[in-house]
Amino acid sequence: MKRNDLIRCTLCLLIAALLLAGCGRSAPAATPSAEDLKPETDVVRLAYTLELSANGHIFNAIAEQQGYLEDEGIRVEHVMVANDAAVFKAIQKGQIDVASNSGTNLPLQQIAEGMDLTIFGGYMLTGCMPLFSLVDTEWDGLEDLVGKTVACEPNLYAITGPLLDMGYDPLHDIHWLETENQIDRIKAVESGEADFGVVGTTLNYEVNTNPNIKILAYASDFLPNYSCCRVEAPTDWINEHPNTVRALLKAWIRAMAYYDLHHDETVEMVARLTYEEEAIIRAYIDNPHYDMNVDPMKRSVERAWNYMRDMGLFSKEAEQIDIDDHINVELYKQALDACQEQYGSENPKFYERMQAQFALYNN
């Protein structure tokens, strides 16, 4: 081969190699378009039980009233069922997409029994759940429950978990009186059938105005940030509707930011929507123990799972379950970041606080 031909051939090979190398480089990630983020469905079916009629879902009510759901291109359809047990049966039948007010213990029990649910957000971080007794009962602290009868279920880990940490066996060291409904727990204490009782947030008015009983403490006094109600859905549904989940969370985060600045207006709205007297609503919503929060609170959920497992509330098969496989914090973080970018100027301190909380409880 002639010298000039050899040079030309070498240059051609070099140029070709450079071109091929350029083709192998990753292009900068494109910003998702509005079409890419469009919700996969415009309707989310949210569980709503007869037991919730006193307060419903306050963040969702705000989101509807303020147009936040509409801004995200979705609407929430309330699916009425009788109670929490019916919520999970309806989820299994495909009649409900999302549950938000069924506690943390109940979805964890469902997961332990093999139901493929994923927790992706929160509603109440701590409800103001009162522990009460007759007015003349002496009280020195949580250990006073040992050897007594408590009108409640032992899966209330906000109380049984700290007792477990103290070295007690809560399932056997306390007699648990399970009743048909929570009003009956109050009656059980009044009649002397139970020494102590615990009821849910919305019964604070009934407990506070009952002259025969007194509030000794609240669940969050024993276990701060215990995770009262988590938001969960079938894992497959979340995987198939990530944009819808983000849209729902964005609407609820904005509602939480609104609530942060408009407490009294929210009370008036809840009273109007539920036809309840403001005094009944303020008995819990003004209580400092009452903390609504959309954050999934992964660390609190893990702690709850460990307490329930260690107390023997799960089957042996549940020991093979990694609860982290049933917690999705990424979609919430994406929704929070998007809200802060779009609406952060409306309440900067709120978004800074929520970002700090996420970093503390979800990493």
What do the PLM-derived regions correspond to, one by one?
Residues 176-177, 183-273:
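Pocket-lining segment of extracytoplasmic ligand-binding domains
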Residues 240-319:
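Secondary-structure end/capping motifs
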Residues 309-363:
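Conserved C-terminal helix/tail region of periplasmic/extracytoplasmic solute-binding proteins
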